[in-house]
Structures are given as C-alpha cells and as structure tokens.
C-alpha cells in the first residue's frame, strides 16, 4: 500500500490460498497485518477469507496521526489518514475497531490472537476444516512493546519484541 486510499492492491484475478481452500470446504480466516491494499475491495474477505481482523499498513503509517506535525484538517485526515484496525467478513460486513495508535500497538497482537483462537474454536465446534493465517505485528521496526516485555532479551527493544512474539505463538 503506497498511501491510504490508493487504488493499488491485490487484484481480483490473483488467486489466494484461502480461495482454493474455501472451495474445498475450509473455513478461512486471516488475523493480523495485511499489506495488500486498504480499500474494501482489497480486504482479505474479498479474496477467499471468511473473516479478517487486522491492520492494513506498516506500523509507522498508523502512528503518524499522533505526530504533532501531522495535519489536523479533518478533510486531510478523511482523505489521507489511515483506517483503523478492521474486522471484516465475507458477507460484506466491515467494522473499524479504532485506530492502531502507539498504545494499542503494545497489545494488538493479543487481540488478533484471541480472534484467531475464537475462529478456530467455531470451526472445531462445526467440525469444519480450517485455515488460519496469523500475522503478528511484532517483527516490524519500529514496534511498541508493553512494559512487561522490556528487557526480556537483554538485547534491546527489537529482540525484546521477538521474545514477546515467541511467547505469543508458543
């Protein structure tokens, strides 16, 4: 994604693994980051996924509105500002769950994990095969970690985030 609202993204003719698996009866979900376009037609739920809960940009794009130099004009924000964390479904429902600001970045992967686990539970209860694509935000530079992860590695914030990621996924 070049800039928010750009008309570039995954194309309708691009076949995804989710599309192929859905044709075989799988429940398909993507949770976490997705960088294949931010307009609704580019959301994973338009490309084979039953459910998507995640962010659409590299992390520093999402924290830009917190910068004191970021334009405060509402028209600018409406046209060029990043979308919030999106929860969408194959039936066309799309909800903006709020901005991915610096504070939320500390724990957003826990939100994504919880949503992925709920998806898996529902598929298991329905005795349906499933495919989950989980993309945490932790391995980005710059990342924001919660206080509890500071110093875990003894090698700086990036490696602390990696230890936090390892703890998240097991």
Task: Set out the residue ranges of the language-model regions.
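Formylglycine-dependent sulfatase
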Residues: 1-170
